[in-house]
Amino acid sequence: MPRGILNANQNKTYAKRYAQEKLKEAGLDKTEWKALSTLWGKESAWDHKAQNPNSSAYGIPQLLKMAPGTPIPKQIDKGLQYITKRYGSPTKALQHHLEKGWY
């Protein structure tokens, strides 16, 4: 985990690298990374402090039960757990998002 205060771009870079590693550990390929990157880009622009003005969704994955201030690794881990449990993969989650406007 990075030390000290990071600027917004460094946080986004760190979050993306962390997510790529988690996907790699799960044996998922670059297609899944591209889908995840697109999905969370649409949801939060990879901003770990993103707040949805219309709901309680927060953070990179825009989860409803994500507390403000949740560390980036925990946001990524919880987001990937949600995607895996609900959709099976980032590509399926992105497809749902493209069809419905949410995931």
Q: Where are these predicted regions, by residue range?
A:
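Peptidoglycan cell-wall recognition and remodeling modules
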Residues: 4-103
